[in-house]
């Protein structure tokens, strides 16, 4: 079986050595080169054409952000960013994902993370997963935005209620998918949007802030007890489950720190299943790119107990990881499976 060929780019000799050891200890992975800065790394990527690259965010000479941009322009390969848990690190990481990185790994204790082995299983898992992703150059990705998409199917299902709520679940590749969907929704959209994106604490705030700066709608990290408003998207904070509950005639956010569900907190299952208790609302659920099957069980509960749900899933054509959508499709829970570019217009169509 062919090994996954990886390049490790980090300015710390200690981090290069330990990350290389972590990867080389997996029989499925071979580290073919290491690099101490972005410029050296770019040259080795062009020379060796690896299957995947791990890239530190903060480096001298050419930092991780500049290196990522050059790699995606000149020799696109899947990139996994390594980031610190600081606010600046989170902001840079979200920017990197938006600029083409496939995923990120959080260093437990800063740039030189002596306890990096605490996340060694995550490093191997994400590197192997990233190696299967087909990445596009920056030019290809921007051109794709303007390509025509397949005709959206006509839905022969009338709205049962006057009010609606949109819910979205996503994981790997989610920040870029959310950017595509949310930036195409109009400011006056007649529904609140609740979102679970698998992400650690700190990073969801940076994601919400970035999306808010480029979307017509408002985007914010959800706060416990706040009343949902149309035209606003609420992203579950990392480390908290998010549910929706009735408060009088309104809907409100409920956050809790109950144990992770199947390894996830926030959990898409938890969000979707909470919607079965919301009466007199049309519900539009979307499952976007992501690894695993989070969302399927919750959607099943929702559809068993609520007849006013329309379910969408991102197709394999555009999903960076076709795991979560595929699980829901295979369970027979999805009404419409479509490319990412078709989803915003269908959401709007269902709300008008």
Curated annotation (Swiss-Prot):
UniProt name for this protein: Protein-glutamate methylesterase/protein-glutamine glutaminase
Alphabetically ordered keywords of this record: Chemotaxis, Cytoplasm, Hydrolase, Phosphoprotein
Domain CheB-type methylesterase: 163-352
UniProt xrefs under SUPFAM superfamilies: CheY-like (SSF52172), Methylesterase CheB, C-terminal domain (SSF52738)
Gene Ontology process terms (BP): chemotaxis
GO MF entries: phosphorelay response regulator activity; protein-glutamate methylesterase activity; protein-glutamine glutaminase activity
InterPro entries tied to this protein: CheB-like, CheB_C, CheY-like_superfamily, Sig_transdc_resp-reg_Me-estase, Sig_transdc_resp-reg_receiver
PROSITE patterns: CHEB (PS50122), RESPONSE_REGULATORY (PS50110)
Active-site residues, Swiss-Prot/TrEMBL: 171, 198, 294
GO cellular component: cytoplasm
Main subcellular location: cytoplasm
Cellular location(s): Cytoplasm
Family annotation (HAMAP family): CheB_chemtxs
Function (record text): Involved in chemotaxis. Part of a chemotaxis signal transduction system that modulates chemotaxis in response to various stimuli. Catalyzes the demethylation of specific methylglutamate residues introduced into the chemoreceptors (methyl-accepting chemotaxis proteins or MCP) by CheR. Also mediates the irreversible deamidation of specific glutamine residues to glutamic acid.
Reactions it catalyzes: [protein]-L-glutamate 5-O-methyl ester + H2O = L-glutamyl-[protein] + methanol + H(+); L-glutaminyl-[protein] + H2O = L-glutamyl-[protein] + NH4(+)
EC primary class: hydrolase
Annotated positions of the 4-aspartylphosphate modification: 56
EC number: 3.1.1.61, 3.5.1.44
Post-translational modification: Phosphorylated by CheA. Phosphorylation of the N-terminal regulatory domain activates the methylesterase activity.
Family the entry assigns: Belongs to the CheB family.
Comment, domains: Contains a C-terminal catalytic domain, and an N-terminal region which modulates catalytic activity.
Domain Response regulatory, first and last residues per copy: 5-122
């Amino acid at each position: 079986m062919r090994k996954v060929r990886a390049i490790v780019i980090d300015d710390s000799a200690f981090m290069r050595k330990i990350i290389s050891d972590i990867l080389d200890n997996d029989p499925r992975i071979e580290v073919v080169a290491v690099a101490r800065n972005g410029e050296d790394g770019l040259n080795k990527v062009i020379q060796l054409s690896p299957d995947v690259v791990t890239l530190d965010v903060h480096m001298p000479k050419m930092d991780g952000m500049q290196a990522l941009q050059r790699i995606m322009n000149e020799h696109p390969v899947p990139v996994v960013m390594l980031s610190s848990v600081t606010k600046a690190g989170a902001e840079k990481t979200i920017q990197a994902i938006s600029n083409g990185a496939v995923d990120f790994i959080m260093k437990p204790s800063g740039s030189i993370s002596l306890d990096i082995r605490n996340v060694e299983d995550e490093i191997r898992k994400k590197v192997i997963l990233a190696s299967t992703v087909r990445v596009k150059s920056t030019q290809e990705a921007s051109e794709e935005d303007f390509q025509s998409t397949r005709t959206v199917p006509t839905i022969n299902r009338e709205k049962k209620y006057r009010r609606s709520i949109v819910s979205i679940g996503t994981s790997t590749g989610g920040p870029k998918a959310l950017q595509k969907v949310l930036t195409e929704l109009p400011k006056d959209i007649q529904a609140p949007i609740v979102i679970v994106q698998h992400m650690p604490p700190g990073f969801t705030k940076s994601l919400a802030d970035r999306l808010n700066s480029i979307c017509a709608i408002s985007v914010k990290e959800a706060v416990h007890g706040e009343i949902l408003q149309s035209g606003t998207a609420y992203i579950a904070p990392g480390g908290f489950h998010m549910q929706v509950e009735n408060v009088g005639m309104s809907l409100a956010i409920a956050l809790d720190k109950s144990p992770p569900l199947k390894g996830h907190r926030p959990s898409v299952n938890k969000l979707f299943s909470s919607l079965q208790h919301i009466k007199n609302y049309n519900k539009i659920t979307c499952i976007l790119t992501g690894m695993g099957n989070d969302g399927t069980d919750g959607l099943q509960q929702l559809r068993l107990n609520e007849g006013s749900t329309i379910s969408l899933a991102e197709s394999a054509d555009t999903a960076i990881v076709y795991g979560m959508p595929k699980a829901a499709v295979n369970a027979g829970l999805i009404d419409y499976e479509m490319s990412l570019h078709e989803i915003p217009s269908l959401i709007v169509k269902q709300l008008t």
